[in-house]
Amino acid sequence: MFSKSLEALHHAKRYRKRELFDPLLKDYASNDYLGLSVKKDLLQNAFNKLQSFVSHSPKASMLVNGYHPLHAELEERLANLLGFESALLVGSGFLGNLALIDTLLVKNALLFMDAHYHASGIFSTKIKPNQVIFFSHNDIKDLKQKLFNAPKNKIKFIAIEGVYSMDASVAPYDFYAIIQEIPNAFLIVDEAHSFGTIGENLLGFLEYYRIKEKDKIIKLSTFSKALASYGACILAPLQTIEFLTNRAKSVIYTTALSLLDTALTLAHLEYFIVQKQELKNELSKHQQIIFETLGIRTLAGFFTLEFESNPALLNAHHFLKEKGFLVGAIRPPTVSKPLLRVSLSLKNSLEDTKELANTLLNYSKIQSSFKSG
């Protein structure tokens, strides 16, 4: 039934498959930026949190009887840590974007979304396409023009990522400034790749720009990157959270977040709060190695290298695997051009990162097929 489509994917070098990689490979492919996924003492802490409760399963939707004390504790701790009035757990970042876009786009609202916003957000806009306007990536001038052309009486949501997942760029401060100029404008910030990687205390985009006033901000923070767990949380003013709780289909009609993931997120969050400065210093050392060796400066927990073609990308990916390094090989249509995505996970040593950087440098001397992203 799908043979021709699969053949076309093979021919274009776009075919994907699930693969069990050699655990001895150095992991520079995952989003485990702070290296928490290998800390077994934190896993034991998570189990200990669960042991004190009769049930270890969420059982139902949060609006039936699936809401658990661990859920409430995580919401409260995140709201306090990140300086928001209220918080709402969701099953994943994908479900979080679906909840925000499907629910907040009421009849008199428009959404202005960065063209490079995460695929889950772009997918969610298809529900209400007539209420969505895309602007050029990180282009404040293009956004201002589109806002100027929009009806003045509409509620306006502007959706950006703190750190963009496929180019490591940090969204400009101007996106926050513009919502202060427009009375009925609000900012949605997907902090999936910025929490745990930027900011004085690694708290993300809002801390990076020292933004204190959050009454016009809605933050989506995921647990599957720096916090090495699963799930996500929407943080916003209380009224917004109450509205989402009552209207968001991906909150109402889905089982509450796994209690094991919730406990694991709490355990990892507690460790992060205590160790954040040490983690920041360690991440900075990895970033400095990449800059000194390859001349690539990244503010985030990863960097990218752009390739001319899928075969060239896959050749580099294979070469690095042979040298003991696993990196991400990201191909169209996920990105416009093939990218090698290199994550600076702290579970790797500084010596590992030096070796990887030198391996990439040596590869670049014999190949002219990539440039820094």
Swiss-Prot record:
One of its GO terms (biological process) is biotin biosynthetic process. The keyword Lipid metabolism does not apply. Substrate binds at R16, H118, T334. It catalyses: 6-carboxyhexanoyl-[ACP] + L-alanine + H(+) = (8S)-8-amino-7-oxononanoate + holo-[ACP] + CO2. It is an enzyme of class 2 (transferase). Pyridoxal 5'-phosphate binds at G93, F94, S165, D190, E191, A192, H193, T222, F223, S224, K225. PANTHER family: 8-AMINO-7-OXONONANOATE SYNTHASE, CLASS II AMINOTRANSFERASE/8-AMINO-7-OXONONANOATE SYNTHASE. Homodimer. Catalyzes the decarboxylative condensation of pimeloyl-[acyl-carrier protein] and L-alanine to produce 8-amino-7-oxononanoate (AON), [acyl-carrier protein], and carbon dioxide. This is 8-amino-7-oxononanoate synthase. It comes from Helicobacter pylori (strain ATCC 700392 / 26695) (Campylobacter pylori).
